[in-house]
Amino acid sequence: MRCPYCRHPDSRVVDSREADDGQLIRRRRSCPECGKRFTTVEEAILAVVKRSGVTEPFSRTKIIGGVRKACQGRPVDDDSVALLAQKVEETVRAKGAAELPSHEVGLAILGPLRDLDEVAYLRFASVYRSFESLADFEREIETLRTAAQAREGG
């Protein structure tokens, strides 16, 4: 790594630490030429390929925005939405791919959102899965009921 002070082409890593729940690596570096120290931050870039074919960087902020819209008027606090977005990011990063289709990001949102708030889940799923009729909603509600009964043991 080039020194930002004297432009010497090499530096020595003095210390490395994880940051942002393991999503970043902060490295403290020292320049052998001028002796000054500086910090670098490394992050693995995750790209999302949209339906149109356009690629853009993964954005936890976009996840939070979409989930907030689905949760509008529901008793869901901001911390729960932020935690859901973190879980989604961890899930998609765990796949190990540098690029993934937006469809997979949507799937990663649906599970945690269903656990957080079923009405918000229905709202999100209706847009994500392009519900076109009342029958689509009825099918999804029946799926939710069946899952709830299975959890309750009856």
UniProtKB/Swiss-Prot annotation:
Pfam families noted in UniProt: ATP-cone, Zn_ribbon_NrdR
ATP-cone domain: from which residue to which, for each copy?
46-136
Cofactor(s) named in the record: Zn(2+)
Q: Which UniProt keywords apply?
A: ATP-binding, DNA-binding, Metal-binding, Nucleotide-binding, Repressor, Transcription, Transcription regulation, Zinc, Zinc-finger
Zn fingers (unnamed): where? 3-34
Entry keyword Cell membrane: no
GO terms for biological process? negative regulation of DNA-templated transcription
- NCBIfam families, alphabetically? transcriptional regulator NrdR
Q: Which HAMAP family match?
A: NrdR (MF_00440)
Q: What is this protein called?
A: Transcriptional repressor NrdR
User: Organism classification, top ranks?
Assistant: Bacteria, Bacillati, Actinomycetota, Actinomycetes, Micromonosporales
